[in-house]
């Protein structure tokens, strides 16, 4: 994706799901997507939330009382993070929310929606295991317009 070259004005919608945090040069891709969208076209994407990608040792920490917390360190130190995922070592690129929004604006986008995903009360009631997801956002959802 980092080397992709898209035709100018060819699309009304671009969508990406849980990919952008793997790219080292997000700015170049955003410029390509902006160029490829027709005027008024929309770019909608999800990415792992920076609170999720930042920690040097991601994973829940359980204290003596059994309370689970998500460790947050190195948030302002952007760059690659090597993590274990499904038995393999993968490289993610951590960026703050501010950096992601700035890159979108620099590429020419107008940001229309930003959501730090958390399950609803109804979703937690249906699946109590989701309750821990209310303690830290795992996903960042954005919509932007050309």
Predicted regions and their residues:
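Adenine-nucleotide cofactor-binding loop residues
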Residues: 1-2, 51
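A short acidic, Gly/Pro-enriched loop at the edge of an enzyme's catalytic core
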Residues: 2-13
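A short SAM/SAH-binding and catalytic strip from SAM-dependent methyltransferases
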Residues: 12-27
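A short glycine-rich, Lys/Arg-flanked "PGG" loop and its adjoining helix->strand segment in the class I
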Residues: 27-42
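Conserved class I S-adenosyl-L-methionine
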Residues: 42-80
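Acceptor-substrate binding/catalytic loop of class I
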Residues: 47, 51-54, 58, 84-99
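Short alpha-helix
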Residues: 79-80, 91-115
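Core SAM-dependent methyltransferase catalytic element
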Residues: 107-109, 127-146
């Amino acid at each position: 994706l980092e080397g992709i070259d898209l035709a100018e004005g060819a699309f009304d919608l671009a969508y990406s799901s849980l990919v952008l945090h793997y790219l080292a040069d997000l700015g170049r891709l955003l410029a390509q997507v902006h160029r490829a969208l027709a005027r008024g076209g929309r770019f909608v994407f999800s990415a792992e939330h920076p609170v999720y990608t930042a920690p040097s040792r991601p994973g829940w920490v359980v204290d003596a009382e059994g309370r689970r917390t998500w460790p947050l360190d190195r948030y302002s130190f952007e760059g690659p993070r090597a993590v274990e995922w499904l038995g393999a070592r993968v490289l993610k690129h951590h960026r703050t929310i501010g950096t992601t929004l700035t890159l979108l604006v620099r590429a020419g986008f107008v940001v229309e929606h930003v959501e730090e995903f958390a399950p609803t009360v109804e979703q937690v009631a249906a699946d109590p295991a989701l309750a821990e997801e209310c303690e830290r956002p795992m996903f960042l959802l954005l919509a932007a317009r050309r």
